[in-house]
Amino acid sequence: MNWKERIGRWHLSRTIAVSRVPRGCSLRNAQSVGLLYLERDHEFYRTIKGIAKHLRDELGVKNVSMLSFVNEDMKNTPGWLVRKLGGGFFCKSDLNWYGRPINEVQQFIESDFDILIDLELEPVLALKYILKSSNAKMKVGPEQLDFPLDYDINIGISPVAKSVGNDVDKNDDMSIWKEQTERTFQFITEANIQ
């Protein structure tokens, strides 16, 4: 961990979470869902779009917003990404010097999502700032030891992911991500959350 990341984590730990009253909701009853994720490649982007389509078409969620962080400067962002109202993406050039997003994400933060889902297994500081600042009624994400209080519902990491640890290649990493994401969506769809 470099010094900028340490300072960013320190600032994040001192950032006061937005005052809100958490309210549970299952995906079957949700009207609006926000998805936070780290952009990887075009195939991953299509996977996320497929998740959003499933939420709309299969579960009847009326408003699905996706927000990704691209770990590049604006001039190097992939061509398939589009900035749009209430979603889209932000990149390194949209962060201040210690990693906090500025400007571009404000409308997403202010959206009153029924459920905000962090799709990242490992903490991404830029996304953590958005998560902490969000007005979402319920925040869901994977168990992260460094950030145990960030979510209203923590979905435990699968035993396979824990046993594999850091010795994974990109394909194994994606299969672990897919398994965790499926577990997350299965839980918040089937659980009687009220």
Sequence positions of predicted segments:
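Short N-terminal or domain-adjacent regulatory/targeting segments
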Residues: M1-S32, H42
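An aromatic- and histidine-rich active-site surface loop
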Residues: E120-S134
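Short, conserved loop/helix-junction motifs that constitute active-site signature segments
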Residues: D57-L59, I109-E110, L131-N135
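Conserved nucleotide-cofactor-binding alpha/beta core module
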Residues: R56-Q107
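Active-site proximal beta-strand in glycosyltransferases
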Residues: K137-L149
